[in-house]
Amino acid sequence: MATLILADLHLSADTPAFNDAFLRLLNAAAGQIDALYLLGDIFEVWLGDDDPAPFPRSIISALHRFATSTPVYVMHGNRDFLLGPRFARESGATLLADPTLVELHGHRYLLSHGDLLCTDDIAYQRFRRTIRQPWRQWLLRHLPLALRQRIGQRLRQQSRTAKNDKPLYIMDASTEEVGRWLLEHAGSTLIHGHTHRPGHHRHVLTNGTLAERWVLPDWRPGQTGGLWIDQNGVHPAPDPLYDLQTHTGNQTR
């Protein structure tokens, strides 16, 4: 069996096609893969575990059913960093620190959402350090939901405006920071999302060694992919539901 890694699904009540694709994937893959890793921004927005909106309930219930047979690991993204203990309990998922070093099928992988690598975006990194402080997160979680919704809308609008004003390279992973991480975790392969620029990169580190980095695809019309990991390494998963047949031997369509 293989391990499946996804990120940047950005699921919401406004993405019924993606929600359905994810639910079908969970149903088909349960018990058929070693583990599922979700490396952040699974949800377009997460305002707290107490949000009673009907949309996330279907995803949480499906994750819980899936987790009874297959481990699920979830990392916070910049959109859903308020995922908390109640979400973990109700979904059956294990929340991961960012970054997290794991060993899968005999190989070491350094997993991250990816926003920490974008160090050229100084304004965003300053905001991230501020908003991720534990006392600020506690305060956010205890604000009235209606106020959190207004704050969330404002932050998303500010994010869209900021992206339009920034050069593309600023919002990409810094090669220098990538190299620093890979040196610190020698012998590992880095896997991350966030940048929405899927690809496979080889880096020559300052000590002369070679290292690999895989960038996960975001989900968008015509693109609902991820990465498979097995004993032979990392493989693109352009259509994980269809790919299950290859990696498990089971027909899914």
From Swiss-Prot:
The keyword Lyase appears for this protein:
no
Q: GO cellular-component terms in the record? A: cytoplasm; extrinsic component of plasma membrane
Task: Name the Gene Ontology biological process terms.
Answer: lipid A biosynthetic process
Quote the catalytic activity from the record.
UDP-2-N,3-O-bis[(3R)-3-hydroxytetradecanoyl]-alpha-D-glucosamine + H2O = 2-N,3-O-bis[(3R)-3-hydroxytetradecanoyl]-alpha-D-glucosaminyl 1-phosphate + UMP + 2 H(+)
The pathway to which it is assigned is: Glycolipid biosynthesis; lipid IV(A) biosynthesis; lipid IV(A) from (3R)-3-hydroxytetradecanoyl-[acyl-carrier-protein] and UDP-N-acetyl-alpha-D-glucosamine: step 4/6
Membrane topology of the entry: Peripheral membrane protein
EC top class, in one word? hydrolase
- Cofactor descriptive note: Binds 2 Mn(2+) ions per subunit in a binuclear metal center.
Q: What is its EC number?
A: 3.6.1.54
Any keyword Manganese? Answer: yes
Task: Tell me a Gene Ontology molecular-function term this record carries.
Answer: manganese ion binding
Which residues are noted in the entry as substrate-binding? N78, R79, D121, S159, K163, K166, H194
Superkingdom of the source species: Bacteria
Where does the record place it? Cell inner membrane
Main localisation: membrane
Necessary cofactors: Mn(2+)
**Residues at which Mn(2+) 1 binds:** D8, H10, D41, H196
Biological function: Hydrolyzes the pyrophosphate bond of UDP-2,3-diacylglucosamine to yield 2,3-diacylglucosamine 1-phosphate (lipid X) and UMP by catalyzing the attack of water at the alpha-P atom. Involved in the biosynthesis of lipid A, a phosphorylated glycolipid that anchors the lipopolysaccharide to the outer membrane of the cell.
Task: Name the PANTHER family on file.
Answer: UDP-2,3-DIACYLGLUCOSAMINE HYDROLASE, UDP-2,3-DIACYLGLUCOSAMINE HYDROLASE-RELATED
Would you identify the family this protein belongs to, as annotated? Belongs to the LpxH family.
Mind telling me what this protein is named? UDP-2,3-diacylglucosamine hydrolase
> Which species?
Laribacter hongkongensis (strain HLHK9)
